[in-house]
């Protein structure tokens, strides 16, 4: 009897193992959902939709985007993916801070994004430093010189505590050894509106959302976080030209729930990479002032490490904690 029971249990375990293997080898056989923890619209959302379209096309299965904003830093959508089944049918498409330093910013959070399984970094785009039209400085070097001589006289607005603009402002002050007065907002739009009105001095933000105002002369482009000067603005110095070794960009990436089999993450990564070789798509991504990457899971792990090495010391030095 015991032998029969053991054989029955063994057969059941074997059947489950075979079923799991078949499920992986047959992946995908139903709709894949890319959870985007931000509102619809904007560069981040568009890049995720490009990824869903190309991944679905190359995998032979529909992939859809589901926007689940909320919770500061996209916590609602991110946490939902962390709790999802590791079967490859629910994926996360989010920005770099989500993958690299969320556990530092949200120290009381009930989740840890380091457990996510990397799939692919989609594209990267530089951060920029912009000033009000009447700001009496045209570049970062002059801003730093004045701020060192007049601590706190210059202010900067950002889109919220622990957000990319906040961290860039703190990074500049840390590396440049100067102080600005911080003015937090709830999102980029109100900060930019106050900058356009001349109510604040500087905002760290993204190029795409501000290009029209820069080109119209309503805002000053003071510096870019790119490794080279931007083609459209050859006279504007990079941050690194003033503060050597300081680069600032952000990237969007796709990851899977903890425990998702490597076979699945590799398959999705290859589908995205193949799709992002499309010249028309790469042109559309360039129009967003971004650079298409679409690398491997290991390349994404390396970028997560680099992001952590950039931002963790800033978070620690500035004692940034988001409640």
Predicted regions located by residue number:
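Positively charged n-region of N-terminal signal peptides that target proteins for export
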Residues: 1-5
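Bacterial N-terminal signal peptides
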Residues: 6-19
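An extracytoplasmic/periplasmic, membrane-proximal ligand-sensing/linker region
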Residues: 29-31, 174-178, 235, 262-323
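Extracytoplasmic/secreted proteins, especially bacterial periplasmic and envelope-associated proteins
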Residues: 46, 50, 54, 76, ...
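Hinge/capping helix and adjacent helix->loop/strand transition within the periplasmic-binding protein
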Residues: 83-89, 104-190, 239, 244, ...
């Amino acid at each position: 009897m015991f032998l029969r029971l053991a054989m029955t249990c063994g057969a059941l375990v074997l059947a489950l193992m075979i079923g799991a293997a078949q499920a992986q080898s047959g992946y995908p056989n139903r709709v894949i959902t890319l959870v985007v923890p931000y509102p619809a619209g904007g560069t981040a959302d568009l890049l995720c939709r490009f990824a869903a379209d190309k991944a679905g096309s190359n995998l032979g299965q529909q992939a859809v985007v589901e926007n689940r904003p909320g919770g500061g830093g996209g916590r609602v959508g991110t946490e939902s993916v962390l709790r999802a089944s590791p079967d490859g049918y629910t994926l996360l498409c989010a920005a770099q801070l989500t993958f690299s330093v969320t556990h530092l910013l949200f120290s009381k959070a009930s989740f840890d994004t380091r457990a996510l399984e990397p799939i692919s970094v989609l594209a990267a785009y530089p951060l920029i430093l912009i000033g009000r039209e009447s700001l009496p400085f045209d570049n970062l070097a002059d801003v730093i010189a004045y701020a060192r001589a007049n601590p706190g006289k210059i202010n900067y607005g950002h889109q919220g505590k622990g957000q990319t603009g906040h961290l860039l402002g703190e990074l500049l002050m840390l590396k440049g050894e100067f102080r600005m007065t911080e003015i937090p907002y709830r999102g980029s739009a109100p900060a930019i509106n106050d900058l356009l009105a001349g109510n604040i001095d500087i905002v760290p933000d993204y190029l795409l959302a501000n290009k029209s105002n820069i080109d119209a002369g309503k805002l000053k482009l003071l510096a870019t976080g790119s490794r080279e000067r931007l083609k459209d603005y050859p006279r504007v110095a990079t941050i690194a030209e003033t503060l050597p070794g300081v680069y600032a960009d952000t990237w969007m990436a796709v990851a899977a729930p903890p425990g998702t089999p490597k076979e699945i993450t590799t398959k999705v990564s290859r589908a995205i990479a193949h799709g992002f070789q499309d010249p028309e798509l790469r042109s559309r991504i360039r129009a967003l002032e971004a650079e298409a990457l679409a690398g491997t899971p290991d390349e994404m792990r390396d970028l997560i490490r680099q992001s952590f090495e950039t931002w963790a010391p800033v978070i620690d030095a500035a004692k940034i904690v988001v409640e």
